[in-house]
Amino acid sequence: LIASNKSPLIIGHRGASAVAPENTLAAFARAFRDGADGIELDVRLARDGVPVVIHDTTVPRTRLRKRRVARTRSDKLQQIDIGSWFNRAYRGLARLEYTRQTIPTLDDVFRLLANQPSKELIVYVELKAGRARKKNDELAAAVVELVARHQLQRRVVVISFNLRAVATIKELDSSIRTGALFGPRQRAVKSTRQIIAAAIASGADEVLLHHRIATKRIIDAAHELRLVIAVWTVDDPRWLARARSLQISAILTNHPAKMLA
């Protein structure tokens, strides 16, 4: 993991998404203000090849909810209000600034990171890779180019469920840290040995486990091969003691402030 004496690191999952609209600059800034050690976000390619920060293939919770990200230019995506839904859904947390939130580019997020006082904050960038190898390679190349442009090789971890995409990142720039994502769906069909072998084969530095499958057995197996372990998505502070006992290096959470209280 990025050099740190703190364990576990607290990472804002899609920003401080429990208290701000997910994957927005407001959510990322809130996570930093709340004391998070970093943020996690999702990236896809817009029609013009620009990496934009959004989880779904379409734009949910907006009047343009059927618009496909891959078929829309980034400048058009940056005009779409993706914050107002949060104010309507969570009136007690509503803020005027959320009505001005639009889909950010990955470049926007890296610029926000550069403006933070701490130069140790990190970003987990999840590649939302599909089945098309060519498109996945284009996404990986675009992310690597941005990481290099902002000189963030030591502060970014590129992660994905698509382990071919993880391997591509390492092929393009071996200095960028990578992580292999595994959830209950993968655990249902893979043994501990198969999960660890798949992570190693991808060249990953880290294994990111859904909290339901983060057992001592699999964590110990990963540590034996010097793989760093992160767990997602945990909003219960009682998990911190377990994380420390299992030597988990990072926790992805929707609510950094709650985990740090």
Residue map of PLM features:
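Metal-dependent phosphodiesterase/phospholipase catalytic core, i.e.
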Residues: 55-186, 202-205, 209-211, 223-225
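Catalytic domains of carbohydrate-active enzymes, especially glycoside hydrolases
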Residues: 30-45, 199-207
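Short, glycine/acidic-enriched loop or turn micro-motifs at the edges of active sites
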Residues: 16, 43-45, 58-59, 129
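Active-site metal-coordination segments of metallo-dependent hydrolases
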Residues: 17-22
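C-terminal active-site rim and adjoining tail of enzyme catalytic domains
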Residues: 180-261
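Amphipathic, non-transmembrane alpha-helical secondary structure
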Residues: 25, 29, 33, 103-114, ...
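N-terminal amphipathic alpha-helix/helix-capping segment at the start of soluble metabolic enzymes
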Residues: 1-12
